[in-house]
Regions:
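Short, acidic loop-to-helix structural element flanking the phosphoryl-transfer center
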Residues: 44-71, 77, 81
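Helix-loop "lid/cap" segments that line or gate small-molecule binding pockets
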Residues: 24-28, 32, 36, 83, ...
Length: 172
């Protein structure tokens, strides 16, 4: 059986430009400002964010092949749930695990380890699909197979520098 742990923003959802556009550089790590943006984003996420090209087709193919998949995202589930339902993405995934629920950000492997455990899979059986270089590195260092997906909004360096076993420019 194949197990996949997907990131959402920048990997399946074309949302990173919006997230980064919502902050000035000095606000990016301000907790209060992050909460304000999350609340605003919940209202707009399903309206303005689209799936990345090829996302639905890839998920449909993997699902039809019997893959077992989940979401492991820094974005709180309550923010992205309307988007997931609008585009029917929720039907492909066993569960949605966010960093708040996991108790740590993606600079620590907790979310990936908990996702594998909830899938009933070993680390060696799971593939993590990520756009973020630091998240890909975290998963890689924890022993996961990693596929890095390039998103120009999150990759200040070439996606070939991701700590990934494979990289792709898109999901098509």
């Amino acid at each position: 059986m194949k197990y996949y742990i997907f990131d959402l923003d920048g990997t399946l959802a074309d949302s990173m430009g919006y997230w980064y556009g919502s902050f000035r550089e000095d606000e990016r790590y301000d907790h209060e400002r992050m909460q304000q943006v999350r609340l605003a984003m919940k209202e707009k996420y399903a309206e303005i964010i689209q799936p990345r090209p090829g996302a639905l087709e890839l998920l449909e193919r993997l699902y039809s092949e019997g893959a077992v998949m989940c979401i492991a995202s820094a974005t709180d589930r309550w923010v992205s749930e309307p988007f997931m339902k609008k585009f029917g993405l929720d039907r492909f995934f066993r569960f949605y695990l966010d960093c708040t629920e996991a108790g740590a950000h993606k600079d620590k492997p907790d979310i990936f380890l908990q996702a594998a455990q909830r899938l009933g899979a070993s680390i060696a059986e799971c593939t993590v699909v990520e756009d973020s270089a630091y998240c890909a590195e975290t998963a890689h260092n924890a022993g996961f197979r990693v596929i890095g997906i390039y998103d120009p909004n999150t990759a200040p360096v070439s996606y070939t520098h991701l700590r990934a076993h494979e990289t792709a420019a898109n999901l098509v």
